[in-house]
């Protein structure tokens, strides 16, 4: 019984860190927006404030890795000290959010990404409980001796897996989207969603009707399109010219760059929610989001031929399943490596 009780704090802390790290890591772009909000409130500028996505990836990977290390039981004393330090920082931050007039301007801490939000009071209570668990865990392992580097392979696997989760989502867009504009979402059912023409008349319903007759490819951009962007879109423009798809640009008022495309406008918050990248495109078929691509890494041709819209929708239809298999495979490798090390492998 005592053995079970000794493992309670590490298991609870590990589960919480894994959940928090993965929920943020599956959408590091959204976490970077929250970090930018913090930097703005704190008045930070320069290198740190200029690279929020990089810090977001580090934060998500760090939380996920710490949770996996707690669950695997390697380097227990070092991990326990690290957990106390992290929870002390998080608790201090949420106390500032809860009681500082400036902190109250931040709507939520972003602990669980876009999956769900907690009020400042609930977040502070959660962190106080987790901090107490971290101190309890440190007390439990205080007398344990150092076992050298045994466990380094498990640690390496945890680090690689934890870094891969946010990096994949940052580059190739979230495979699981908790926002209302994810793959499979009906755009017309999203409250407050609107797209406008050059006269600022709403054309959302008209565009959804167009997508009912043939797929609508909407380029989503928060900046002017470059020559390289237009080159990558040439295959899609050719499909539009052949009448197989409809093609347009959704951007900010005042920006153009359509280069022959119909240009429509919406607000910046909507653009950031539609696509977790500065510029990319989404395929809407029958009013339903079927596929998304980050234009910065999009390859317009494979094996000497252009990638067709139908291929992209088929690929994205099976994306959650493939992603789930990869995650389970990564976890299985970590369990296998940990078991080998526990059996005496070095």
Predicted regions mapped to residue ranges:
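Short active-site neighborhood of thiol/selenol oxidoreductases, capturing the structured segment around
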Residues: 206-226
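Functionalized membrane-embedded alpha-helices
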Residues: 3-25, 52-96
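Membrane-embedded alpha-helical segments of integral membrane proteins
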Residues: 88-143
């Amino acid at each position: 019984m005592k053995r079970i009780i000794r493992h309670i704090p590490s298991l609870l802390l590990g589960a919480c860190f894994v959940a928090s790290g993965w929920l943020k890591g599956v959408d590091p772009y959204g976490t970077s927006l929250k970090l930018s909000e913090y930097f703005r409130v704190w008045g930070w500028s320069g290198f740190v404030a200029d690279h929020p996505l990089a810090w977001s990836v580090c934060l998500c990977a760090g939380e996920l890795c710490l949770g996996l290390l707690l669950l695997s039981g390697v380097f227990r004393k070092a991990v326990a000290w690290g957990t106390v330090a992290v929870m002390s920082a998080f608790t201090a931050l949420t106390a500032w959010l809860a009681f500082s007039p400036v902190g109250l301007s931040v709507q939520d801490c972003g602990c669980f990404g876009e999956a769900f939000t907690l009020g400042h009071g609930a977040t502070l209570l959660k962190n106080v409980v987790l901090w107490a668990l971290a101190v309890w865990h440190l007390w439990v392992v205080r007398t344990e001796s150092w076992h050298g580097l045994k466990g380094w392979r498990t640690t390496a696997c945890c680090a690689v897996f934890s870094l891969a989760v946010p990096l994949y989502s940052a580059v190739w867009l979230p495979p699981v989207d908790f926002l209302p504009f994810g793959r499979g979402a009906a755009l017309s059912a999203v409250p407050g969603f609107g797209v406008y023409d050059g006269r600022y008349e709403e054309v959302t319903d008209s565009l959804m009707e167009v997508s009912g007759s043939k797929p609508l490819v909407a380029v989503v951009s928060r900046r002017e399109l470059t020559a390289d962007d237009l080159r990558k879109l040439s295959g899609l423009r050719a499909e539009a010219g052949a009448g197989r798809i409809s093609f347009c640009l959704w951007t900010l008022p005042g920006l153009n760059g359509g280069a022959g495309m119909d240009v429509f406008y919406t607000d910046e918050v909507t653009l950031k929610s539609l696509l977790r990248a500065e510029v990319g495109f989404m395929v809407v078929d029958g009013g339903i989001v079927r596929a998304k691509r980050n234009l910065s890494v999009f390859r317009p041709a494979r094996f000497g031929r252009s990638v067709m819209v139908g291929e992209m929708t088929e690929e994205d239809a099976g994306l959650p399943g493939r992603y789930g298999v990869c995650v389970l495979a990564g976890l299985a490798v970590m369990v296998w490596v940990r078991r080998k090390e526990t059996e005496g492998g070095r």
